[in-house]
Amino acid sequence: MRKGLAPCGPSQRVSSNAPTSGAGGNLAAVVAILARDAGDLPIAYQLLIYPATDMRRGHPSHQTNGNGYLLTTETIDYFHDHYIDEPAHDHDWRASPLLHPDLSGLPPALVLTAGFDPLRDEGLDYANRLVAAGNRATYVCFERQIHGFITMGRVIDEAHAAVTLCAGELVRALAR
């Protein structure tokens, strides 16, 4: 990433965001930590949309929301098993950023979740850890929604509200 952004020059700011889903939020969170530790990548903001932050998959929402909605426990397990090849890697912060011992000094963040998403609780826990570590983080849960709702603007009105919220936060963050 640093090599790809080098032509932009040192004054350019980057947002670490996840326009896809939980896996994109996972990668964005990990990249923000790596960039902080490297000290040379100017990430201005983290937009974490229903992020997967704990590969152990033990949060209560995995049980309560793991069946009957778009993203199921079976689907999560399928993707997990294609991403993580050793069970011990679930405990590595590079797979589970929630487990990093030091989340201080990270860019401001918006963590957006859905009420009926198996990933809801780990997103909330990550937002809480960011705040506890002294970062500016906002947590918003669209309580009546499922994983992936933000891409369903033609059928779900709250998707428009979520996109508007995300766009507004990015505009403010990148204007600084």
Predicted feature residues:
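Alpha/beta-hydrolase superfamily serine-hydrolase fold, recognizing
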Residues: 1-176
